[in-house]
Amino acid sequence: MNRRRFIETSAAAVAALSAASCSRTRTKWRFLTDDEAETLAALCDQIVPPDDFAGAGQAGAVEFIDRQLMRHYRKHRATYRRGLAETERRSAARFGRAFAGLSADLRLEIAHSLEREQPAFFNLVLNHSMQSFYGSPRHGGNRDAVSWRMLGVPDPPVRGRSTDYVKGDTVSPHAAPVASAPSKKVNAVVVGAGAGGGIVAKELAEAGLSVVLLERGQWNTPNDCRKDDLRNQRTSLLGAPFGPADEGNPRVFVWIDGHEQIALPSEGAYSNNAACVGGGTLSWGAQAWRYMEKDFRMRSTYGALEGSTLEDWPISYQDLEPFYEKAEWEIGVSGDDAANPFKAPRKRPLPMPPLSPNREYEVLQPAAKRLGLHPFDIPMARNSVAYNGRGPCMRCRWCVGFACEVDAKNGTQNTVIPRALATGNCELRTGCMTREILSDDRGRATGVSYYDADGRLQTQLADFVVVSCAAIESARLLLNSSTRLHPRGIGNRYDWVGRNLQGHTYTGAVGIFDFDMYDDVGPGAGLAICDFNHGNPGLKGGAMLANEFIRLPIHAVNGLPPGTPRWGIGHKQAMRAYYKRTAVVMGPTQEMPMADSRVQIDPRVRDRWGIPVARLSGDRHPHTLEIGRAMCEKATMWLKEAGAVRTWPMPPGRGVSGGQHQAGTCRMGDDPKSSVVNRHCQIHDVDNVFVVDGGVHVTNGGFNPALTIMAVGYYGSAEILKMWRGTGMRS
């Protein structure tokens, strides 16, 4: 008997015991029957078989799936019920026995037939078995963290812990009162408490204006953190913990073939950002990049591009530079870009030194230098030392997609919003969904209507309105604010609201090394090059390339070398062999904007409040894909020089853009016929409505956009205050 046959036969015997044990020890399932549970345990142990370590069935896959069929997987109940019955029918028809009692070879035969002929059911079991085995133990699978022990990664506590604040001069956000009732007329109502809106609220409140800050989500604290590999903003397989909830918050996603999908926030097509105080800055990876000077004048640098609305920004890098600096110091950024010869000029260094290198950094940095490239430390909105009253990063692997359990990751929720509230001039209302911007018979805004935390429709009057809901939701709000004078929505006289939806097409390469690259020192990403952001022959722009954040085990399931089996003993052995020896180099390809990549209002689908939802459609420009393919080659070159013995590309894909780096839908420009807001972030035809978020970006650079959104927040606030003091926006 050869080794493979021995393993499979031994696995069958162990799996049979697992299935029998499953049936004997669990008599009260939430959804499954005892017979279904026995069948499912045997099938899960085919997908992740037992060897020296338990298989998926032994490690609690049935408990995991049964629990989720009453929760997040409710819509899959019928598929499971039919599929498990079909599994038993095939087993009885072919072999005259129950599936759990078959030999390894016969069970594999049934499993392969299900994969071929019942793919919807089989793929569910495949995905859910992998999630249970490689995900967080708190959901019933991965019992005793068996997969993490198999891969050689630590098994930390599942729950977060309280934050011990370092004494400082900032206000703890968790002591701030949060109101929900309407108030008298105020100077400004700001819709959205994220990267842009939080800054605007703070700047206006500190200038003495009365401000109401409306946020649809909640104010999460470090004590709300959960180290959950399956339920976070990046890997939302069991939901997005910082909102919005799946129930009642759909969007319509149109594929390039015209097929329409109703997408939920936990699904990739949704382009979700966190809906909470702090917005995406609560759970971001915290890369805090300045755009380069050329990123603001792409049309002047490269000329027109057929099929693209490529244009220059109406403002320059020099206009934003002091506001970049202000964001870096008030939010808090660590890093050192002294070794980056391509950086835009700065007047002041970053306030904190970089984090110390991890293993990937130590391998990739000298390789980049050997290639004549210029590696340097990524700027991070993360404390490397105690700063602004909070302690330093503890270097865990749960970073991007997670809130920081020690509050060392900096966002508007723990920096500027507490300062806004401390003035006494700003009132924060959470759980409040804005329905529309209200306007008078002259077409000027008078305030907003919104649903409060109890679902009651309220009105908040204001001298002016600031929209900061992120690019997709900001466009949706403007389009839903239609009146007699604004029949197509506020700012949409020339049909530009919602167009030019951009994000970033992430591309790069994966490398396998013959030594460990993984050392469990977070956040993972730490080293970057900007050699290919511009100056690539025949290309308009490029991308920053960097090592990736730590890949959790669940991320590696579908990231193994091409040709690896999707399941079975071969997949499990590949996970064990390659997980710690894999490194990823990737970057955000600068996208070429297109008018047909857009946000519209769906005519049929509405959310839980009865508001028409966003409809996303379009495609990526062919030149964007060309840039992405070129970046794959550059990343591959870097990995090979670093010693990778095998590499493969992460090529760009077609389809609607957006994602967490969404931008462009309320484009800034001097011409009202081709833009939505002017250079002051002011709607062209409504002088007391402003948009201050990534929606105003004309182009989105080859970098993570959050620091630019923050800089625009400070810049836009300064422009608003100039107009407030000078011309009287008071109504």
Go through each PLM region and give its residues.
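N-terminal secretory signal peptides and thylakoid transit peptides that target proteins
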Residues: M1-V14
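Mature-region segments of soluble proteins
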Residues: A37-E38, A42, G57-A176
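Beta1/beta-strand and adjacent pyrophosphate-binding region of the FAD-binding site
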Residues: P182-G194
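Glycine-rich loop(s) and the adjacent beta-strand/alpha-helix scaffold that form part
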Residues: E203-E206, S210, G217-R231, T423, ...
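N-terminal FAD cofactor-binding segment of flavoenzymes
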Residues: N220-G285, F323
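Conserved redox-cofactor binding core of oxidoreductases
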Residues: L237-L238, P244-V252, A263-G268, R290-D295, ...
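FAD cofactor-binding and catalytic pocket of flavoenzymes
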Residues: D257-G280, W284, R290, D295, ...
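A glycine-rich dinucleotide-binding beta-alpha-beta segment and adjacent secondary-structure elements
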Residues: D377-A381, P392-C399, E436-L438, K580-E591, ...
